[in-house]
């Protein structure tokens, strides 16, 4: 992934504008100019969509809550994605990361302050609370802004040890340190509230949405009093098993990190000068001590996450009492058929007997029961299907959905993506994250995931329409394209089943999921 950082300043004399009276406009050079609360920015126009990238929304010292960015003079050029939060991954060059300059967001809009109040959709990237960025091509907001006449926003924020290290034992100055990564997102939402009208958006109609870790962040925001009133609808995609830490565990982990570095709580200020890689090393050692050996394949920084401290974050998301501060928020939630499961679709000649032999290693004498329940849920199953179904995300989603409707009367919709990608000879199934390019209507930007079949484009058109309609009205129904999408109830489990033929299903897999992972 290649990111460009360009924070050049253009003098006012070149543009011939007065900062004090700068209304949104387009220069003779086709540069859209907007005055924000912190300064004037210029962007670009891409196929009729006004685009601003790398817009500063905050600044912060290490482990401190975010503050407003310093105001700037002149016009700040915002035409390239900003730096990425510090993280250790193989697919992002470290030169593209910056601990100080990561606090930026991106905006795509069809018009600037034209009197219309467009719905705003703010995307939170995946990667747990550990990795990721807002600059993934498949989450480019142009297609949604163009198709749905909405304002799209995406945001970078602090991650892993820099975003979620609990130093509360070191004094009141650090009492919020365990949650500063999420407070960054709250700060971005405040920026939206204060500025989005200049970009043609409605600050009173903001939908937050995200997948995987991004979905977990959506659920976390729903439990944060500071975020109350800053968003009005929410979409959680494959995010209901992203748990935060208890206050006791996060505090113990923070002290373990200090111990690894040979620093006492009284010497906490020394953390400000320790290189990031040394912090990560100490963090990994501390996680090992607190959690035990890292499971093979789990993220390096697995263990740093927000802390349910009862103040910044009231409780564990997706547990009883979930989102008591946002019971009035319309919500949409869903998963994919296979998620992160290793699939057997490449084994074209797999027989039912061979599949059953493997299943017996998992279910023993209950294997026939599993197959019977699977057949009830998916009558047209193949032997490969039996070995490939998600057994983690879907059960948690059903459990969360049941609790949500018991505790909230706000509209609540559930979806399930069963459509299998045609890439790699259809061997990947309906995998984790496949709903992202479909919901963004970005098949052309992620053909290595979706393929380029007519079915992929058709489904992307339908799903993106549903996401857009939900952002506009709180109702995802797409008249003439989908059967009626009813709100979820425990009794019927109404779920929109996205496939080559879309349909509304009713508790189609509840018994199967309860067998795999008891839903109570």
Question: What label would you give each PLM region?
Answer:
Residues 18-21:
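C-terminal motif of bacterial Sec signal peptides marking the signal peptidase cleavage site
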Residues 23-179, 203, 300, 340, ...:
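Non-catalytic accessory segments of hydrolases
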Residues 55, 395-520:
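Mobile gating loops/cap/lid regions near enzyme active sites that modulate substrate access
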Residues 91, 194, 228, 237-355, ...:
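Substrate-access "cap/lid" subdomains that shape
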Residues 102, 175-197, 255-256:
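Alpha/beta-hydrolase active-site loop
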Residues 126, 180-184, 212-215:
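Active-site loop->helix "elbow" adjoining a glycine-rich segment at hydrolase catalytic centers
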Residues 199-211:
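Alpha/beta-hydrolase fold nucleophile elbow
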Residues 215-227:
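Short glycine-enriched nucleophile-adjacent loop
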């Amino acid at each position: 992934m290649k990111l460009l950082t360009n924070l050049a300043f253009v003098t006012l004399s070149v543009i011939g504008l007065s900062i004090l009276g700068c209304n949104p406009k387009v220069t003779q050079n086709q540069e859209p100019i907007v005055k924000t609360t912190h300064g004037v920015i210029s962007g670009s126009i891409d196929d009729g969509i006004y685009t601003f990238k790398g817009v500063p929304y905050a600044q912060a010292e290490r482990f401190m809550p975010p503050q407003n960015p310093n105001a700037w003079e002149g016009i700040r050029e915002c035409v390239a994605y900003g730096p990425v939060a510090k993280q250790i991954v193989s697919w992002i060059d470290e030169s593209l990361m910056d601990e100080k300059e990561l606090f930026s967001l991106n905006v795509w809009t069809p018009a600037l302050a034209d009197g219309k109040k467009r719905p705003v959709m703010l995307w939170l990237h995946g990667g747990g609370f550990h990795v990721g960025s807002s600059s993934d091509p498949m989450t480019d907001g142009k297609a949604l802004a163009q198709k749905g006449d909405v304002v799209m926003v995406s945001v970078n924020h602090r991650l892993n040890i820099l975003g979620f290290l609990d130093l509360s034992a070191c004094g009141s100055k650090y009492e919020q340190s365990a949650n500063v990564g999420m407070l960054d997102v709250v700060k971005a939402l405040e920026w939206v509230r204060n500025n989005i009208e200049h970009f043609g958006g409605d600050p009173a109609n903001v939908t937050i949405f995200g997948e995987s870790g991004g979905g977990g962040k959506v659920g976390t925001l729903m439990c944060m009093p500071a975020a109350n009133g800053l968003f009005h609808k929410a979409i959680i995609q494959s995010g209901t098993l992203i748990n935060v830490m208890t206050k006791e565990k996060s505090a113990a982990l923070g002290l373990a990190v200090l111990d690894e570095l040979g620093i006492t709580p009284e010497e906490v200020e020394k953390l400000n000068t320790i290189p990031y890689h040394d912090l990560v090393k100490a963090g990994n050692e501390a996680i090992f001590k607190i959690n035990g050996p890292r499971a093979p394949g789990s993220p390096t920084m697995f263990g740093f996450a927000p802390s349910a401290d009862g103040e910044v974050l009231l409780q564990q998301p997706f547990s009883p009492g979930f989102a008591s501060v946002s019971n009035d928020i319309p919500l949409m939630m869903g998963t994919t058929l296979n998620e992160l499961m290793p699939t057997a679709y490449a084994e074209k000649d797999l027989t039912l007997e061979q599949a059953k032999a493997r299943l017996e290693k998992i279910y023993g004498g209950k294997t026939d029961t599993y197959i019977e329940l699977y057949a009830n849920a998916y009558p047209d199953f193949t032997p490969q299907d039996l070995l490939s179904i998600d057994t983690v995300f879907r059960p948690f989603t059903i459990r969360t959905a049941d609790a949500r409707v018991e505790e909230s009367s706000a509209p609540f919709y559930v979806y399930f993506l069963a459509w299998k990608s045609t890439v790699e000879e259809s061997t990947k199934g309906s995998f984790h994250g496949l709903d992202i390019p479909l919901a963004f209507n970005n098949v052309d930007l992620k053909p290595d995931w979706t393929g380029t079949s007519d079915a992929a484009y058709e489904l992307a058109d339908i799903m993106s329409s549903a996401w857009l309609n939900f952002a506009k009205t709180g109702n995802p129904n797409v008249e003439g394209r989908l059967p009626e999408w009813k709100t979820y109830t425990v009794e019927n489990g109404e779920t929109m089943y996205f496939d080559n033929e879309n349909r509304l299903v009713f508790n189609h897999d509840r018994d199967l999921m309860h067998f795999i992972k008891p839903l109570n």
